[in-house]
Structure formats: C-alpha cells, structure tokens
Curated annotation (Swiss-Prot):
Listed name of the protein: Ribosome maturation factor RimP
Gene expressing this chain: rimP
Major localization listed first in the record, in broad terms: cytoplasm
SUPFAM superfamilies recorded: YhbC-like, C-terminal domain, YhbC-like, N-terminal domain
Family: Belongs to the RimP family.
Domain of life: Bacteria
Role, per record: Required for maturation of 30S ribosomal subunits.
GO BP: ribosomal small subunit assembly; translation
Key words, A-Z: Cytoplasm, Ribosome biogenesis
CC per GO annotation: cytosol
Length: 152
C-alpha cells in the first residue's frame, strides 16, 4: 500500500519508540476528515493488550507533541491489527500468501477498484491475487487499502 508523504514521515518518526517498547509497528493510517484520525497498528508474538496500546499511545503522543508533524486536530488510536488485519508492505502480503484479501485500488484495473481473492504470490512490488480462478496482478503502489478477510 502506498503511503502518503505524511504517513511515511510519521512511520519514520514513531518506529523507534514503538520498537523500544518491544512491539512491531505493523503500519499507520492517517484518515483526514472533520475529526482526523491517526491509527497505529502494533503487534508482538505475545499478542497485544489494552495496556500495551496505552503504553504505545503515551510514548507516541510524547514524540508527536515534540515533533508536531500534523497541522490539524486529530485523534490517536493504537490497536492490534485484528482479524481483518490491514496489509501495508510486500512482506505482509508474503506472510499471508494463501489468505483471502480485500483490495481497494487507487486506479481501476479492468474498470474495477475493489477486488477480493486469495493472495497467490509476491514478486518485488507486484502482488498476485487469484480472483474467481483468474490471477490478477496489482502494483503495491496502486493499492490504496488492503485487508485480510476473516472467515468464521
């Protein structure tokens, strides 16, 4: 998923503090709106608790207060990726080969922006998703949003 310049800057800024607390920074989303939201996804082998999210929120807030990279009012949310985990990097897609994924593209392919299928392969920055038995290849830069699709 292509990150905006702000999201790239924020990722660089908060990766070290998150990792210093013993967590993996899975990714971030900055959602602009009437009430903008900075959403941070963290993970660890032991799982994530509410206290873990609070600790990361406190640490990240301190960094953001000093650096002040966001010019508008926003809410900070810290959470685990969850069952419908967002995918941000080629490594994330590689980790979940064989899993169902929902993809929203920035620029339509075959007149479609929304796709759902099974992650088949990752080759550099190209992601292959099998949709209705046919392989579709998407450039990571063209993926606006992607999430795993949980099955219950």
């Amino acid at each position: 998923m292509a990150l905006s310049t702000l999201e790239q800057k924020l990722t660089e800024m908060i990766t070290a503090p998150v990792e210093a607390l013993g967590f993996e920074l899975v990714g971030i989303e900055f959602i602009r709106g009437r009430q903008s939201t900075l959403r941070i996804y963290i993970n660890s082998d032991e799982g994530i608790t509410v206290d873990d999210c609070a600790d990361v929120s406190h640490q990240v807030s301190a960094v953001l207060d000093v650096e002040d990279p966001i010019s508008v009012a926003y809410s900070l949310e810290v959470s685990s990726p969850g069952l419908d985990r967002p995918l941000f990097t080629a490594a994330h897609y590689r980790q979940f080969i064989g899993s169902d994924v929902s993809v929203v593209l920035r620029i339509a392919v075959q007149n479609r922006r929304k796709w759902q299928g099974i992650i088949k392969a990752v080759d550099g920055e190209m992601i292959t998703v099998t949709v209705d038995g046919k392989d579709e290849v998407f450039a990571l830069q063209n993926i606006q949003k992607a999430n795993l699709v949980p099955h219950f």
